[in-house]
Structures are given as C-alpha cells and as structure tokens.
Amino acid sequence: MTTLEEPVQAADTVDPCPPGIPNLKTVLSDDASNSSVLEDIDVSNTSSSSSSSSSSSSSSGSCSGSGTDTDTGKGSSNVGSLDVTSSSSIGSETSISSTGSTAIAGPSTLLDDSNSSGLGLVVDVDSNGSSQELSSHGVTELDSLEDSCSGLMIKDGDKLCKLCSLRLVMPRILSCLHVFCEDCLQAVVSKDTMSASSPNSCSSSSFDGSEHQNRLSAVFIECPVCKQETPLGPKGIKALPCDYIVTNILDLSNLESEHIVCTSCKSKEEAISRCNDCANFLCNGCDNAHKYMRCFENHHVVRIEDLTKNVHDKLIIHKPVFCPQHVSENLKYYCFTCQVPTCNDCLLSDHKGSDHHYETATVAEQAVRADLEETLSDTLKKADYCNDAGSNLGSALTELQSQHDTVRQQIEDAYKCYKRMLESIKDQMLNELGRLHSDRELKIMDLMQSMENTMGKLQHAAQFGQRAVDKANSIEFLLLKPIISAQCLNLMEQTPKCDINYQLQFDSKPEMFEQFAREMFGKFQTDHIDSSPKKLGMTQQLQQQQQQQQQLQQQQHQHQHQVQQQQHHHQQQQQQKQQVQHQQQQQKLQLQQQQQHQHNSNNLIVGHRGSSSVQGRLTSAVFSPISLPSSLQSSFDGDTNSVMSNFSMMDSPPQPSSQQQLPSAQQQSQQQQQQQQQQQAVVLQQVQQQQKHQQHQVQQQQQQQVLHQPTSAQSMPQQLGQLVAPQGIVQQAGHVNLNAGPGPNISINGLGAGGPPPSFSMLEYNISRLASLTETMPDTLNDALAVGGGAAGPVPNVVAQVPGGSAVTGAAVVGASHAHQQQSQAVMPASAVTPTQPITLADILSGDQRALNNLQALAKLGLNNNDDGLLLNGSSTEIDFLSDFCMPPATSPSLQSLNPIVGGVEDMGLNNFHAVAAPGTTSVVTGRNKATPMQIRCKFGSLGTAKGQFNSPHGFCLGVDEEIIVADTNNHRIEVFDKMGALKFQFGVAGKEEGQLWYPRKVAVMHNNGKFVVCDRGNERSRMQIFSKCGHFMRKIAIRYIDIVAGLAVTAKGHIVAVDSVSPTVFVISEEGELVRWFDCSDYMREPSDIAIRDNDFYVCDFKGHCVAVFQDDGTFLYRIGNEKVTCFPNGIDISNAGDVLIGDSHGNRFHVACYSREGALQSEFECPHVKVSRCCGLKITSEGYVVTLAKNNHHVLVLNTLYVH
C-alpha cells in the first residue's frame, strides 16, 4: 500500500440523490474529477456502507465517500465525501487515507450531476479506506497515453493550475479565459471575504458554495494572471463555466486501465465498450442490450479497443451535458432568442412560444461556429497587429534612445560650434581693440614727440634772444633782432594743438543676446504641440521669419541667375561681334592679297573662283559642326551666323599677278566676292538638307540594327563610321564626298589643295589637339606607351597600316579589329612614327586608330582612368617606367565614352595570375607590383553611437554563416551584420564587471557551437569572455599573462589561439580557460598584428617585419612569406579554401592584398583604388571570394569583390 502525503479534503453532507441516477457503489471520475462537471446539484448522505466490499455493494442509491487525488493531493468537492482518483492513480494499488485534520467520511454519497460520473469507474472501498486493485499497469503507460492525448488539444502546461501548480481539479473558466481549480478560485474569494481566516483553511474543507453563498460579498474576482475582473453571480464560483475540453481530454487519458467495470449494471463485470449517449461503460450483457433493445436504438456504442486506437485521430469522448434546471435532461437544443442551450423541459417551460426560436444543437452549431470562427479570425488579426505594434514599439524605443543620443550629440556640437563662434568673435574684438588702441597710442605719441621738438626749439630761440638782449650792443642787437623775432614768431605759429579727446569704450547688450541665444540655439521637434498662446506666437514668428528668409534667398538666387543670363547673353553678343569683325578683317585681307596677286588673265581668275574658293569653303564645311552627329551639334542648330562664323574663309593661295591690271583685278575681285557669297548660301542650304536626310537615315539604321543585328557584330569604330556617314559623306579620315543638291559632284580633300589645314570650331580644335598631344612626347615615354603585355611575353612595337592612312602603335593593335591586325607591315619604335597629317575630329569619329590610341594613351598617362587598352599586366619591364607618372584614380566623362572603341584585354591571357581578374578589367600600376583592381561590393558604417555605426573598431571576424561580427571598441559592444551590411543584432553593455564589455578589441567565433570569444580590457589589462551565440554571458577567462591581444583565432578542435603584440608570444587556451600550451616567437618577428590557422600551422603577421611568419602548432618555426616591397606593414591575414594565403595591408592609404601559395610563392595582387583607408584591421575571405576588411580610422567595413576564383 502506498500512502498519500497530501491532505484529504472532507466533503459536506448533501441531500439525497435525485432519481434517474444509477446505483453505483463508488463512482470515480478520471484525473481527480476533471471529467466531472457539477452544476449546483445537491447530494445527500445515505446509509453507511459496510466494512466489506460485498456489504458495500448491496447498498443502493449510495454515492462514493471522501477520497484524495494522488496527482494533485487535493480533494474534489464534486463527489460528495470522497474525492475521485486521477489518471495516474488508476491501475495502481493506492491506499486512501486521511493525513489532514479531517478524517475520511464513512457514508458514501452520490454525485447528483451525471456529468460527474465521468467514465463510471467502480472501485470498492472498505471501512479502512483501502481501495481494490484495478489494474497491474503502472503510471508509465498512462503518462505516455496522456502525452499523446495532450498533443491533440492542449499542452502539458495547460493541465496545471497556475495557482497551486498541480493538476486541474474541476477547472473553472474566468472571463479572461484563464482556467483554475474551483477550490483555488474559492480560496481566492474566501481570502478576500474572510480576511481573518487562515490561508491554509482552504485545504482543510471543501468549498462547494453551499455554506459561503450567503457570505459572498465580492462582486468581482480578479484573475491572478492578467488581473482582469470577472463578475460573480449569486452562486459564486459555482456559476463559472467549466472547461469541458480539458475534462474530456483528461477522461481520455484513463483508457489505459485494463480493469474497468461496467457502470450500467450491478454485475461489476469488466467493461468492453462505452455508450456515448448514456455515458456509461458496458459489460457484455449491457452491450448486447444496447444492440437489441429499442430504447437504446440510436445510442452510439464504441468499444474500448477502438477508443485507444483512435486516440490520435479525434477527441471522441464527450459526456452529455445536463441542464442546470432539469438535472435529468441533457442539453440538446439551442435557443437563438436567448442564446443559451436548452433541454426538452426548458422548451416546454421557459422557452416555449413563437417568441423563442430554437434548433437542435447540431444545426445551431453551424451558425454559431461560423460566427465564432469569424471572431477568432478577427482576434488573430488583432493579435498580429499587436505583435507588429509591439515590434514597432520596441524599435521605436530603440530609435528614441538613438535619437536621444543623436540630439544630445547635436546639442553638444551646437554648443561647441557657438562656443567657437563666440571665441572667434572675442578674438576679433580683441584684435580690433588692439588696433584701435595702437592707432590712438601712435597719434598721442606722435603728438608728444612733436610737442617735445617744438618745446626745444622755443627754448633755444628764447635763450638765443635773451643772450642777444643781455650781451649785444646797439648795432648788434638791431642786426639780430629781425632774425630772432622771425624765428620766434614762426615757432609760435607752428606750435601743435593738444586736443586729446580719444575714448575707447565697449557697448554690449547681454539681455538681448541671451534672448537671441535662447531662440536661435535650437528647438526640439516632437509629435507634441504646445498649445500655449505665447509659445505658439513665438513659433509662428520664427516660422514667418524663416519663410521670409527663404523667400529672400530665392529672390537673390533668381536675381543672380538673371544677372548671369544677362552677362552670358552679353558675352555671346560680344563674341558674335568679334567673330563678325574677324570675318570682315579676313575678307579685307583676302581682298588685299587678291589685289596684289591678281592674274593677268580673266580666265585664270574665273577658274580660280570656280574651283579653289569652293574647294576651300567646302573643306571648311567638312569640319564644321553640321557634319557631326545630332548629339554633338545641338548647340549649332538654327544659328546660321554662328555656323558661318566657324567656317574658314581662307582660299587656296592664288597665283601671283602683275600690277599693271590693277583696276580690272579690283572689278573682278568684287565680282568674285559676290559669287562666293552666293555659292556659300547655296552650299549651306545643300548641307542642311543633307543633314536632315542623314539624321532620318541614321534613325532608321539604328532601329534596323537593334531588330536584326547583334551589338557585337561590328566593332565600335565601324559603328561610329556608319552613324556619322550613312550616305558616304565621311568615307575616310580627312575626305568628304558631298552628293546633294543641284550642284555638281565635288570631291574635296580635307587638307585643301596642298595648303595648310583648315580652321576648326573650338570643340574640334581641342579634341584634335588632345589626340595629337602624345605624338610630341619624349621618345622613351612614347615607346613605353606603345608596349603591352601578352600571354607569352611582351608585345613588340608594331606600326599597323589601317584604312585611312593612319598608324596604330604598340598594344593598341591588340584591341583593334581582326582585319586591322592582319595588315601589320613593319616593326619599329613608336618614336619613329611621324604623322603625315594632323588629327581631325573626322579621324576620331571614323575610328582612326592613331587618334584613338593617342587619346587612350593620354587618358592613361594623365588621368590614370582604368580603361582598356594600353597599361596591361604583362611581363614587360619597360612599362614599369610609367609607375612614376601614375596619379590617383580619376574619371573622365569625355574620354570614358571612348572605352569601347579600343579592344578590351579579354583577348590577352594573364597567365602569371593564380587568381585571375574578370575580363574587361585592367591592371593598376602600383609602387610595388601590378595589382588587379578590386571593386567595392558593399561599404557600411560611420562614426557614431547609433545602430550600425562604429567608433574606432579594432577587430572583426566571420561567423558560422559568414556574418560579419565587429568589435565596436569605443562603443563597448559587439555588432553582427550580414554580408550586405544589414544589422542583425548587437550585444554588450559598457562596464568592467563580468558580462560587460570595456573597449573590446578582438572577437572570434567557435564554429562548432557558435559561441563568441571577446577580448577586452575589464579591470585588468586584458580579459577574455565567452558569450553564447545569442550574446548571453557564459564565463570569463583570466589572461593576465597577455598584455595586448593582437590576433585571435579558434582552431578546429575548439581551442582559442591568442597572440601577444607586446612580447610576441602565441598562447593556446581551452574553452574552459586552461592554458594548453604556448611558445615564444620573438626571435622570428618584431610585432604581431594578426593570426590565421590552417591545419597545424600558425600564420602570424609581422607588422614591423613586413612579412608573415609560419609556425607549427608546437612553436617550430617553418618559413616566412612576403617582403617589404609586397607586404608592407601587413595587418590582416586569411587562408582560402584552396590554401592560398591572403595578406592585406593599407600602406599608402590603399587596401592592398597579396596572394601567396602555402609554400610562399607570390601568385597575384589586388588593390582597391576607389577609396582611401586608414589603419585597416584584419582580413577575411568569404566562400564567394569576397574580401572583408575593417577600416578603423574610417569607422566602416569594406566588402570587396576580388573575383577570386578559389
């Protein structure tokens, strides 16, 4: 026998059992009467049961006595004087004894509500309170079944009462839908109404509501969980609804008991089935009766084996719910008018008549279910809204703190700014004071000096006159008197006036300044509007002032713009006037030349007028803007004068003429001039018509090319040639063929008839001069520009003859079309190439390789524009000559459009690279080696304290999923980002205690469990702490033997490796904090800066030694990688999946990466020329080949796309 330790609650004496209830010896409901539902039904005590089981079975109409729930240890008030046993007590031999203050009542009572009968389990109870053994199965099988049942509807935690933390007994539902035991709720009510009673009094008696109903003074009961109030009626806790779902599930958990007796008869035979309508277990006889008797015709009988088999499919045990008014009637109907379930008797009494509309419960369920489902859907939507709102509020709280920090910093910055302004004003005032003081001091000192001089002269004159008066005779006195008098009178007239009225005061208005400072220092902008009239008025005044200032600024900008337009218009007018004057001067000069060199024959003059002049003018038309594409000539449309002013009016040199025929020559020259003007107008009209026709055809050709031809079918020079000359207008560089208008077909050389080159417009002149500039360079540099690297070695200096008579030097031939490459004829240095004619705009637009090569070389030399074509990463030693001429990278929009004209470097193999750059990229000539440029894939971070900002971060690492984990040193935190820079989460609180962060310098991740290893200062010089993958503190590791952690890594075994930069030493530490081993490496390096681990080898960067030292895990030195020319001040190292060693440095404010093999052979170099960096810390390579580094002084993280193939 097992004695229960929990106290047993005694039951009150109840009224006799109502009719219709079967005579049962003992009725036990499962799980401590969880299956029983009492609805205020009175039960009474009957005759006492005998001491033996046989005598107790003979008593009819008796109910069970008091009992105890073996799981919860508490009695149930719904079974009279005996609490029913729970599911765990069924099938085990249990002794029901009294351990409390009240003994078990002998008389047996019967549940007055059929719902309380539960499964109808019959148990014999003797006079000693012992129960008959029902089954030999233990608790384990029942618990397993109960777990399977709980997975259907509720969790295990929902079976426990949140007040007593035990299994629910007679669960009651509050209005907030929280479920508690009936006794626990009654205890809460009793505690409120009977403050004098002991809190343990609830455990010594059962509260069924009969004794305390008159003493209920609490109108509401407050939920112990959510504090929501639930109104209580006159019946108190008994009026609260029961949790039928939990009751049914707990009923289902009792099916494991093999010995379940029949509850429908007195035979006490083993039950084989259960009737859902009678809510009784049936023996074999009762089961047959249900099959053949008409009174059980519609009853649903289920065998116990089927119940246990279908336990996972659906909750199939539902006991009938009886009417609270008519205890023998089931609730079968639903009154829509009253919205309550009813029974047959209710329909005949309280719900009769046409005013009440009712249906069966099955029919009414559909309508009510739809309404509840809609309500539940709306409830879930509201829950989602609350969830989102909660997330938003959390973000708003974080954002509010961030804004607080930002505004605080802004206030500090504003104060510092205004302070600097005041200090600047103070300095200006002091300087002004010094100047005023100096000026007045000089004036006073000058006046003093003048007074002293005048005083000396006066004294001298007075002494001289006094001596004459005293010692001179008459004649001497008379002779000296005029001189003395004149001098004295002169000195007295020249005596300066002493008007000293200099005041130096300072006028200040502190009251006005204070008011102005308070108004202009700054205002807070929040969502709250102050409704006070005074503040509203001040705010409106400030807004009006700001609007007035904005309007004044706009007016000033408009006025300035108008003035600029007027000035520009005036300048254009002046330029037009100058052009007209220049044209007139040229015409006069031509006329004088023609008069001096007139021909003797009129035929010769006429012939010259019909050929040479037209030739010269049409030659000018070739290089005028009207021969350009429409995108280059838009500024010339509709302006005939400007177009004509750009024409060259110079003819071919005429033949010399005799001076004898001067009069006839003048007449002929005037006629020639008139004819020339007429011909100019005709040619201009013809050219304009040809231009319109040409533009229309260009548009048609572009549409056809897009629809029918791929873009790569033709080279860029040929496409430009087609766009510029669709009708053969520009056939070759420097040649024009005009076939338009009524005039004759004229073929004109762009250079004229052996004369000088024609005059161009300003745009043509600038571009042609740029294209011709590199041909005047020194021979050495020009030869170097003409050399490119190839796959097999340096490309020889080649001059290729291309159509049009132009030449291409060096590697430009490699980027030209295949047809041009086949026409290479000679080998000579580039300096030996002498252009036979100047480069014109037509040469550039027609694809002349000499012009394009010169422009490309100029772009490479002057701008270092990373274009394709010349500076290739070859093995030529001559190209290193250009390293002294390279400038920082820049962009040239005008030259950038010429990139596609010259062939790319994809045709040239860069076999000396282990990590090959993508086609289309060029090599950057650095001071160390030729490196492949790295493009910035992502850059994130800035100086600040907000989320995603940094303050001098000292270290980072890659996480398990290649997250970027940054040690934000001066912000005392760790931030975790994805590879695109999005902040995932952060952790860390500033402080020196354990679990806090104080200037974290290095961070690493254990890939086997995702834990973070963080090195910071703490109370000591160095400290190491372990955090979980969610950022929760786990333990501290004391590393007093390390001064400054320069590098941090984790081995494959999970050991932490730290290197000390003060005394170069490598320490291997276990996760528990034990020092596994260490070795001194000061003999092989000067200052460590980072460490990487591959297999059993340790790669340690030597910052001051400009190399990487490689050690075995036992400290044995192996070799060094790198040198000062390649790896200058290395500060980051990582090893790719292929085993290549990547060493990074930021020397020269450019992040540079050198790629070595594990044996130490240099394979390739990369460099990022797009951003200047300072003090980069660390280098990591992702699985895609992206290189990640941390710029400490720039306060950001760089993710670079190296196109690394391994």
Swiss-Prot record:
Q: Where in the cell is it found?
A: Cytoplasm; Cytoplasm, Cytoplasmic ribonucleoprotein granule
Q: Where are the zinc fingers (RING-type)?
A: 161-227
Question: What's in the GO CC field?
Answer: cytoplasm; nucleoplasm
Would the keyword Ribonucleoprotein turn up in this protein's UniProt record?
no
Principal localisation: cytoplasm
Tissue localization of expression is:
Highly expressed in neurons but weakly expressed in neuroblasts (at protein level). Expressed in ovarian germline stem cells (at protein level). Expressed at low level in spermatogonia; expression is regulated by tut.
Tell me the impact of changing residue 1175 to A.
Answer: Reduces binding to poly-uridine RNA or the RNA recognition sequence 5'-UUUUACA-3'. Abolishes RNA binding and translational regulation of target mRNAs
| UniProt KW Lipoprotein keyword | no
Per UniProt, where does Zn(2+) 2 bind? Answer: 323, 326, 346, 351
Chain positions recorded as Zn(2+) 1 binding sites: 262, 265, 286, 290
Mutating residue 1017 to A leads to what result?
Answer: Reduces binding to poly-uridine RNA or the RNA recognition sequence 5'-UUUUACA-3'. Abolishes RNA binding and translational regulation of target mRNAs
Q: Which Gene3D superfamilies match?
A: Classic Zinc Finger, TolB, C-terminal domain, Zinc/RING finger domain, C3HC4 (zinc finger)
User: Which InterPro entries does the entry mention?
Assistant: 6-blade_b-propeller_TolB-like, Bbox_C, NHL_repeat, TRIM45/56/19-like, Znf_B-box, Znf_RING, Znf_RING/FYVE/PHD, Znf_RING_CS
Gene deleted: what happens?
Answer: Viable but males and females are sterile. Males and females show defects in gametogenesis and in chromosome segregation during meiosis. Ovarian cysts contain overproliferating and enlarged cells with enlarged nucleoli. Cystocytes fail to differentiate into oocytes or nurse cells and maintain a fusome or spectrosome structure for longer. Ovarian cysts can become tumorous. Loss of germline stem cells (GSC).
Q: What stretches of residues are NHL repeats?
A: 937-980, 984-1030, 1047-1072, 1088-1114, 1115-1157
Q: What induces it?
A: Post-transcriptionally repressed by bam-bgcn in a 3'UTR-dependent manner possibly targeted by let-7 miRNA. Post-transcriptionally repressed by tut; tut targets a specific long spliceform. The dcr-1 dependent microRNA machinery is involved in post-transcriptionally repression; target of bantam and probably other microRNAs.
Ranges for the region named Essential for interaction with AGO1 are 934-1206
Effect after changing residue 1192 to A: Destabilizes the NHL domain
GO biological process terms, alphabetically, are: gamete generation; germ cell development; meiotic cell cycle; protein ubiquitination; regulation of macromolecule metabolic process; spermatogenesis
What are this entry's molecular-function GO terms? Answer: ubiquitin protein ligase activity; ubiquitin-protein transferase activity; zinc ion binding
Name the keywords, alphabetized. Answer: Coiled coil, Cytoplasm, Metal-binding, Repeat, Zinc, Zinc-finger
Subunit and interaction comment:
May dimerize (via N-terminus). Part of a complex composed of at least mei-P26, bam, bgcn and Sxl; this complex is involved in translational repression of nanos mRNA. Interacts (via NHL domain) with AGO1; the interaction is not direct but does not require RNA. Interacts with bam. Interacts with bgcn; the interaction is direct and does not require bam. Interacts with Sxl. Interacts with wech; possibly involved in RISC-mediated translational repression. Interacts with nanos; possibly involved in RISC-independent regulation of brat protein levels.
Query: What's noted about domains in the record?
Result: The C-terminal region containing the NHL repeats is required for interaction with AGO1 and for regulating ovarian germline stem cell proliferation. The C-terminal NHL repeats are also required for regulation of brat expression. The C-terminal NHL domain binds single stranded RNA in a sequence-specific manner; preferentially binds uridine-rich RNA with at least 4 U residues followed by an ACA anchor sequence (5'-UUUUACA-3'). The NHL domain is essential, but not sufficient, for post-transcriptional regulation of mRNA translation.
Q: What does this protein do?
A: RNA binding protein and post-transcriptional regulator of mRNA translation; can act as a repressor or activator of gene expression. Binds and represses translation of several mRNAs in a miRNA and 3'-UTR-dependent manner, possibly in association with components of the RNA-induced silencing complex (RISC). Represses expression of brat in a RISC-independent manner, possibly in coordination with nanos, to derepress the BMP signaling pathway. Binds nanos mRNA and involved in bam-bgcn mediated repression of nanos mRNA translation. Regulator of stem cell proliferation.
Protein name listed in UniProt: Protein meiotic P26
Tell me what organism the protein belongs to.
Drosophila melanogaster
